[in-house]
Amino acid sequence: MNYLQLAQRLRREMNDTGEGPHNVTNQTGRNLEYVDAIREAWLDIQSLRPWNKRFCGNGFDGDNLQELEASSDTPFIPKQFHVAIVYYAMQSKALSQNAQELVMRGQNEWDKYLHLLCERFLPTPSLGK
């Protein structure tokens, strides 16, 4: 999913009526909140752990994070993990709306994806030498 699709998916997961966003620039109101939540969630996820080189896309690392700016920007992680960004964003968005059932759902889904991300992209610990 690209940046725009992630923001649209977040809106659906939040059970928000209406349409949009239709792009990620020049947004106001709720659409701006969804766009911002996705951008911030992706930056947070990149900074959560000391991910290994397989996690990072070309030219990106813990010191040079990928910022989503254009509608077509796509997070560098494999496609099957893109929805993790939505669930991470959903937690804070649901908190701001005092929607406890959505907070719980966001946390449960994010926990599943965090486990998968850690299993696949954290350096393997070693003992001794």
Regions found by a protein language model. Give the residues of each.
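Conserved short "hinge" loops at termini or chain/domain junctions
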Residues: 1-74, 108, 112-129
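Exposed beta-sheet edge/beta-hairpin loop segments within beta-rich domains
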Residues: 75-80
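Extended aliphatic helical segments
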Residues: 24, 35, 83-86, 103
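Short conserved catalytic/interaction loops centered on acidic-Pro-aromatic/His motifs
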Residues: 97-108
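Generic hydrophobic/packing signal
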Residues: 10, 34, 90-93, 103
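Short, hydrophobic/amphipathic alpha-helical patches that form generic packing surfaces
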Residues: 83-95
